Swiss-Prot record:
Part of the 30S ribosomal subunit. Forms a bridge to the 50S subunit in the 70S ribosome, contacting the 23S rRNA. Gene3D superfamilies: 6.10.250.3130, S15/NS1, RNA-binding. It comes from the Bacteria. One of the primary rRNA binding proteins, it binds directly to 16S rRNA where it helps nucleate assembly of the platform of the 30S subunit by binding and bridging several RNA helices of the 16S rRNA. Forms an intersubunit bridge (bridge B4) with the 23S rRNA of the 50S subunit in the ribosome. This is Small ribosomal subunit protein uS15.
Length: 89
């Protein structure tokens, strides 16, 4: 499986405030980014997989909403996370 508990724990410990921090915006954005990257690779091989395409679009929307929230709440945290993950503004 592409996203097991150990990989999630690694993402949360790297981007969250602690190992068990699963709710902070940064941790959720990092997890969504990992899933988006994986689904993008899947879509390159399976162009007609429309259910995955929809799931990918929904994940991008969720990540965008969290980024907008973080930008309004704390601009420095927003800038740090987009620089760390290599996202466009």
């Amino acid at each position: 499986m592409y996203l097991d508990a150990a990989k999630k724990q690694e993402i949360f410990s790297k981007y969250g405030k602690s190992n068990t921090d699963t709710g902070s915006a940064e941790a959720q954005i990092a997890l969504f980014s990992y899933r988006i990257t994986h689904l993008t690779e899947h879509m390159k091989l399976n162009r007609k997989d429309y259910s995955t395409e929809r799931a990918l679009t929904m994940l991008v929307g969720k990540r965008r909403a969290l980024l907008d929230y973080l930008k309004a709440k704390d601009i420095t945290r927003y800038r740090d996370i987009i620089k760390e993950l290599g996202l466009r503004k």
